[in-house]
């Protein structure tokens, strides 16, 4: 599916009706938000991009209740705020359950997320599972914890989603996450694959949704800073993601600096695949391709 140019463009034109809906106040959690024109423009851009992703990938199809993963980072806080705002406007007909999985990392501030989620009035669940000890035991010295830690977290979130009667797990991955994953697979895995905006889990009973797929990380960072979310650092365990992802992030930043707009172009390319111009015979029947007699 080809991504609409408008879905990624800051100057997207929207209908007068939708503009009126976005201008009609905001969820109470935005009560202390900046009143500047620039922030209002940023907020509406992110709301439009989330709505576009919901529509493009049919994320609302069959959905009744979502488990929203909240780690305490800028991305998941922003995702939850935008979803709550859309729901408040009557544009998101699903129930939201925010969930944080405390994985037993050292110095994790246990009060921050419960206090914040309680203050904004969202149904939430905080669960403690000491996966950190498992990761420390299994991962060789000097290696990063992130991959195994992520897999253990995902498995627990699936379980919690089922226990909460949710039909989808909603995560805060954004445009840069998707592009970095694509190039990691491209350079290191020898395959064309990325992080899909919508995925059915292996068991076939839960969807994994990424409504921030079109949103730029820089926009999310500005939004989170303006909203003054109580950010919890992601390096409490002392382990950071490997050099591969950092290298991809640096490469993409350099390309965007030298050729502004290339990240959006790359993202559109992921939705405009021409199988006959690639080399995978499983995607295109090259064997039967021959000139007319």
Swiss-Prot record:
Its EC number is 2.8.1.-. Pathway: tRNA modification. GO terms for cellular component: cytoplasm. A motif (PP-loop motif) lies at residues 71-76. The keyword Membrane does not apply. Homodimer. This is tRNA-cytidine(32) 2-sulfurtransferase.
């Amino acid at each position: 599916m080809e991504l609409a140019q408008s879905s990624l463009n800051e100057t997207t034109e929207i209908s007068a009706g939708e503009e009126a809906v976005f201008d009609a106040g905001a969820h109470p959690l935005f009560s202390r938000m900046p009143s500047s024109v620039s922030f209002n423009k940023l907020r509406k851009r992110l709301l439009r991009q989330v709505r576009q992703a919901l529509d493009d990938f049919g994320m609302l199809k069959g959905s009744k209740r979502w488990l929203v993963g909240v780690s305490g980072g800028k991305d998941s806080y922003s995702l939850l705020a935008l979803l709550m705002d859309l729901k408040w406007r009557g544009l998101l007909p699903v129930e939201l359950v925010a969930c944080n999985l405390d994985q037993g990392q050292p110095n994790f501030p246990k009060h921050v997320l419960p206090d914040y989620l309680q203050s904004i009035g969202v149904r939430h669940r905080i669960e403690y599972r000491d996966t950190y000890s498992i990761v420390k035991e299994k991962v060789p010295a000097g290696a990063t914890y992130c991959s195994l830690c992520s897999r253990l977290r995902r498995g627990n979130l699936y379980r919690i989603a089922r226990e909460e009667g949710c039909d989808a797990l909603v995560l805060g991955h954004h445009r840069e996450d998707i592009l970095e994953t694509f190039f990691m697979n491209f350079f290191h895995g020898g395959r064309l694959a990325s992080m899909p905006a919508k995925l059915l889990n292996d068991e076939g009973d839960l969807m994994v949704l990424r409504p921030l797929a079109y949103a730029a990380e820089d926009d999310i960072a500005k939004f989170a800073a303006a909203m003054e979310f109580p950010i919890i650092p992601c390096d409490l365990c002392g382990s950071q993601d490997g050099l591969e992802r950092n290298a991809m992030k640096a490469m993409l930043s350099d390309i965007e600096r030298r050729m502004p707009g290339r990240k959006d172009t790359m993202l559109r390319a992921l939705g405009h695949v021409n199988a006959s111009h690639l080399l995978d015979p499983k995607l295109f029947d090259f064997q039967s391709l021959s000139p007319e007699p």
